[in-house]
Each structure stands twice: as C-alpha cells, then as structure tokens.
Amino acid sequence: MSKRQPLYYLVAMLVIGAFFAGQVIAETEFADLESSLDDEELLFGDIPSVFSASKYEQKVTEAPARISIVTADEIQRYGHRTLMDVLNTLPGFQTSYDRNYSYTGARGFGVPGDFNTRILMLVDGHRINENIFDGVVPDRGFVVDIDLIDRVEVVRGPASSLYGSSAFFGVINVITKRGRDLQGAEVSVATGSQESYQGRISYGERFDNGFEMLLSASGYDSEGDDRLYYPEFDDPASNNGIAENVDDANNRNLYAKLSYGDFTLSGVYEEYEKGVPTASYETLFNDSRTRTWEGRVYLDLKYQLTWSTILVQSS
C-alpha cells in the first residue's frame, strides 16, 4: 500500500463528512421554521405565506430559506417605531447607531460605516438600496412610515442569484398596506422625550369597481439630546467636549399606492435631515452646520400576472 493512500482516505472522509454536515445544518434550519409553528397551527391554522424567498408566493414551510415574518399587529404590539427596531428583535441580527445613521449586521458580522451594503432592502419588491454606496438606512429616514407596513419578510442567507448585488446576508422585503386595510381616513399624533413630535394622516379605500388607493403624509421632528460629552474633544477650544443642541432630526414623507386589476402604481417622496454631533469626517465639533441630508423620489409601475400557483410574471 502506498504511503499516500491513508492521506487520500483522510481527505475523502473529511469531504464526505462536510457534505453530510451541511445537509444536517440545512435540514435543522428548515426544521426550525416548522417548529416555530405549533402543531395546532400546522393542522388547523393558516400557515403564513412568503413571496421574497423564491419570487412567488409559497408557504413558509416550503420556502428554501430561513425566514422571519413580522406583521403589522406585532409591530403595534411591541411598539416598534422604526424598521431598525424590528430588525433588532430578530435572531441573527445586531444593530448600532453612531448619532448619524443606524447600521445592522447579520450572523455576527457588520463593518462600521458600510451603510448596510450587504443587505438588500425592498419595498413591495422595489429596490431601496441607493446607487452611490449601494446602502440603505432603515431608521427614521426610511422611505415608508412604519404604520403603513403590513408585514416585513426577512430572508436570511445569500440570494444574489435571484436579486443580484447586495443580497449577501439576506433580503428584507417590506410589504405595505393596501387601501382595503384602512377603509377610510386615519390620523395619528405622537410626542415623546427630547421634544419629539410625530404625525401622520392617511386615507385608504377599495371601491366597488376594483380600484384601490392609499395616500399618506407623515412627519417627524426631534431635538435629540441637548448635551453630549465626547472625551476625544475635551478641550476649551472644543467647548470642553460637550456638543450642545446639534443632535436634531426631522423627516418628511409622502406615499401613494394605486392599484387596479394587475397594475399597481406606487410613489414616494422622502427627505431626511440629521444633525451630526460627532464631528465625523474631520468636521468642526459642536457646529450646527454639520448635517446630513438625504432625499428620495421614485415612481414604480408594476404589472403582475399569475399564470399558475408557482409562476408569477412581474414587469
């Protein structure tokens, strides 16, 4: 027997072991999906459906991915006010905040300052990642008010074969409400600490001829923390490291969704402004002129035709 044969056997055993270990892990993750639903729900209840995993609607127990679904009822029950609050409650996600943007990582990995470029964010299937850094910030500056979210579908793992770039850690698809979910007008007003104020007015309706509409306008203003201490700037020339009244934030958002038959027209106008107290990018410390501003406008026309229960064509 050649001396190299035991080495070949060892390599072969390692390869076979890795293959079966991968199968066990995959089967375990799939089993976790089913175990999250109790036996009575599997037998008698409605098993949730998901679209994002394969780009057609299927039961979560049939989807080839690890999926979490957060509904509007859960968002209201737990008092989430931003999409970042939702992600912070999900297993495998971690979030951080640098007084300018919020960041999220997955599976213990998150590069500071990468603007969440490894997660693909969708709103009703429309790509939200911007075209400069390919990033997205799911906090107060998100394009849709959280009260207009019907559910959030979170698909873990790479999905670049379906969605292209950014879908490395996962895909987050925000499904918005429809006119039938409101059936009239809604007015919401809230206030909180740090002189924070938030308001929203929405109108939704589904008419007898099948036409459906949802219109909404919302705004948010906050003064933030009035005094923040940074030891790195503890010097008389830098106000002894104290940033005063430079942590404010405000957001304005308009959203419209019209649908008739297989056609859906949706549009967004959003602008977000944030004071930056950390003097990032070598700017002046404790200077109210240091600000971040971003805006987004998009109009999306979608035609969706369902040929069968597993074949959906969208354009």
Identify what each model region corresponds to.
Residues 2-5, 9-10, 15-78, 84-88, ...:
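N-terminal Sec signal peptide and the immediately downstream disordered periplasmic leader
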Residues 47, 52, 59, 84-127:
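Extracytoplasmic beta-strand/coil segments of soluble accessory domains associated
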Residues 83-86, 104-108, 119-124, 139-142, ...:
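N-terminal periplasmic accessory domains that precede
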Residues 86, 155, 175, 200-204, ...:
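Transmembrane beta-barrel domains of outer membrane proteins
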Residues 103-105, 151, 171, 186-188, ...:
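Membrane-embedded beta-strand positions in outer-membrane beta-barrel channels/transporters
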Residues 127-156:
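Short acidic/polar hinge/loop motifs at secondary-structure boundaries
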Residues 161, 181-182, 190, 202-290:
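Periplasmic-side early beta-strands and strand-to-turn transitions of outer-membrane beta-barrels
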Residues 257-273, 293-315:
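Face-selective signature of the C-terminal outer-membrane beta-barrel domain
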